[in-house]
Curated annotation (Swiss-Prot):
Keywords: Cytoplasm, FAD, Flavoprotein, NAD, tRNA processing. This is tRNA uridine 5-carboxymethylaminomethyl modification enzyme MnmG. The gene is mnmG. It comes from the Bacteria. GO terms for molecular function: flavin adenine dinucleotide binding. FAD binds at residues 8-13. It comes from Campylobacter jejuni (strain RM1221). Belongs to the MnmG family. The keyword Cytoplasm applies. The lineage of its organism: Bacteria, Pseudomonadati, Campylobacterota, Epsilonproteobacteria, Campylobacterales. GO terms for cellular component: cytosol.
Length: 619
């Protein structure tokens, strides 16, 4: 008898099984190929805009993805560095082979975790409660909780031209039996599609005509726990399609599964295939291609931006029309894959299914796309399954606390009909949710769950104390326009002042940096770089942050008014049938969650608030 069974060893499965095992739960991970645990099925990179936030938040609570990325990374960059700190994003190219090996070894070393190379065929469900799993080897495993992290494997169907192949990804069997079984549980399900790009033999590329894209000179680690971070970095390259490339693709539209009706699933809006780009943006004469090394040996390159399901011979033809790729030899062809997913409105915020007790879902099965989105969900599912076993309150991150909170809330409340990916624009309070303050926002959760060490949490507390002390000093200390103070400002290369201001206003200047902050007062001289950076950020955006915090307080009032789990919305007089129907379907846990449901009017929310408050007074 296991406490937790995790089905699927992708990025969601890695985080789910690790979290559960580290929280003391006897855990079993079932995966089709142990060698493929933590595999990067698509591009060899972790992070990016908003995705980097998810990785940092995982790391802040004790997740694995950040540490693995730092160990396996072969190029590190900060995206949007010229823009505000709220929308900057960390991204790393990874050695995809090394990443898998590190992920697998981390799991194999965990005391409470067993791994078995089997494919789940059927769930054992009694009275709408999951009890265990039956596998393709006829083994039966019982568990208190089961977490589905099946990725693209549920009835996975690969498309290349007119050819179709049942598979979860190239070389691995699709999960047909489990996919068909889930259809019998009365869950709302759909079909989605994603795709991958060709990989090319490095020897066949003429790099001399490509634009070089180097990593950052001073690379920054994803994990705050990474020590002595000094990675060996490789360059990426940029190529461009041309009108010849586009003509080849257009001439083969009739063979594209995307256009022939062969593919029925909905694809990712923000990561279209090259044939979809040429069709939708026919006025464009060129599209960027990012040429990314797959491993530190750089023997094979991933052609990012060239996702396709066109026939093999067409892929070669169109790639060879690109400058630098005239003699390109494709080692692995691109393909599209369709798969089943469960509509995420079927889930609670804990990622447990509403209809099947003790059954949790995380990753692409919930309609998301991306390694980072999957890992974040897997981590939270593993945590909440473990907390539920211990009969403790679940961990549900609010929208103002974390991008992970935004991700899960969007899925559960709004649902999705297309692969969902995270953007900074999805977060209302993104100035509060900066990458670099993730440990300050979420570190205590990780420590309380036993996923962060005493040493890690002490480090976080020291930064928090420095931030509070430094910001209070800047806000309380007045700077008068006398000769001494103005001379000091001029020595820093700053403009003089003509009226009394507090130091926060001076530090808020665009030209004011960390080196100047150190010279401002002895209080800052001994502080570490992390603390100084956060003091600087908080000072520069102080008024905007204050406004967002005021908005958060209003939201908290709604969030703290909880709706009982089995609440009878029909009992509330004054609610329309449409509102009752939507509330019964979504089962929002709070008034704020109810406010996010399309069609729930302010008047309905007022009625509901009054009714719930009256009921609480009666108790």
């Amino acid at each position: 008898m296991f406490d937790v069974i995790v089905i699927g060893g992708g990025h969601a499965g890695v985080e789910a099984s690790a979290a559960a095992a580290r929280m003391g739960k006897k855990t079993l991970l079932l995966t089709t190929l142990i060698e493929q645990i933590g595999a990067a099925s698509c591009n060899p990179a972790i992070g990016g805009l908003a995705k980097g936030h998810l990785v940092k938040e995982l790391d802040a609570m004790g997740g694995l993805m950040g540490e693995i990325t730092d160990e396996a990374g072969i190029q590190f960059r900060i995206l949007n560095e010229s823009k505000g700190v709220a929308v900057q994003g960390s991204r790393a190219q990874i050695d995809m082979d090394k990443y898998r090996i590190i992920a697998r070894n981390k799991l194999l070393k965990l005391p409470n975790l067993e791994i078995s190379q089997e494919q789940a065929s059927v769930l054992i469900v009694e009275n709408d409660e999951v009890k265990g799993v039956k596998t393709n080897l006829e083994n039966i495993y019982f568990a208190k909780k089961v977490i589905l992290t099946t990725g693209t494997f549920l009835n996975g169907l690969i498309h290349v031209g007119e050819n179709k192949l049942q598979a979860g990804r190239v070389g691995e069997l699709a999960s047909v039996n489990l996919g068909n079984y889930l259809q019998t549980l009365g869950l709302k399900m759909g079909r989605l599609k994603t795709g991958t790009c060709p990989r090319v033999d490095a020897k066949s590329i003429d790099f001399s005509v490509l634009e070089i894209q180097d990593g950052d000179v001073n690379p920054k680690a994803f994990s705050f726990r990474s020590r002595n971070f000094n990675p060996t970095q490789l360059p990426c390259y940029i190529a461009r399609t041309n009108t010849t490339t586009h003509e080849i693709i257009k001439n083969n539209f009739y063979r594209a599964p995307l256009f022939t009706g062969q593919i029925e699933g909905v694809g990712p809006r923000y990561c279209p295939s090259i044939e979809d780009k040429i069709n939708r943006f026919s006025d464009k004469e060129s599209h960027h291609l990012f040429i990314e090394p797959q491993t530190i040996d750089a023997t094979e390159y991933y052609i990012n931006g060239f996702s396709t399901s066109l026939p093999y011979e067409v892929q070669t033809q169109m790639l060879r029309s690109v400058k630098g790729f005239e003699n390109a030899k494709i080692t692995r062809f691109g393909y599209a894959i369709e798969y089943d997913y469960i509509e995420p409105t079927e889930l609670k915020h804990t990622l447990e299914l509403k209809k099947i007790k003790n059954l949790y879902c995380a990753g692409q099965i919930n309609g998301t796309t991306g390694y980072e989105e999957a890992a974040a969900q897997g981590f939270m599912a593993g945590i909440n399954a473990s907390l539920s076993i211990d009969m403790k309150e679940p961990l549900i991150l609010r929208r103002d606390e974390a991008y992970i909170g935004v991700l899960i809330d969007d899925l559960v409340v709004k649902g999705t009909k297309e692969p969902y990916r995270m953007f900074t624009s999805r977060a209302e309070f993104r100035l509060l949710l900066r990458e670099e303050n993730a440990i300050l926002r979420l570190g205590k959760y990780g420590y309380d769950l036993g996923l962060l060490s005493e040493q890690d949490f002490t480090y976080i507390q020291n930064i928090a104390n420095n931030l509070q002390k430094g910001l209070e000093f800047l806000l309380s200390k007045e700077f008068t326009p006398n000769n001494q103070n103005n001379a000091f400002l001029e020595s820093l290369g700053e403009d003089k002042i003509s009226s009394i201001v507090n130091l926060q206003k001076i530090v808020a200047r665009a030209s004011f940096d960390i080196e100047k902050l150190k010279k401002l007062d002895p209080i800052f001289e001994t502080m570490d770089h992390y603390s100084l950076r956060e003091i600087l950020n908080e000072a520069k955006y102080y008024h905007y942050i204050s406004m967002q915090k005021a908005q958060v307080e209003k939201m908290k009032n709604l969030s703290e008014l909880k709706i009982p789990e089995n609440f009878d919305f029909k009992s509330v007089s004054g609610l329309s049938n449409e509102v009752v129907e939507k509330l019964n379907h979504h089962k929002p846990p709070t008034i704020f969650a109810a406010s996010q449901i399309s069609g729930i009017t302010p008047a309905a929310l007022d009625i509901l608030q009054i009714y719930i408050k009256m009921q609480k007074k009666k108790v």
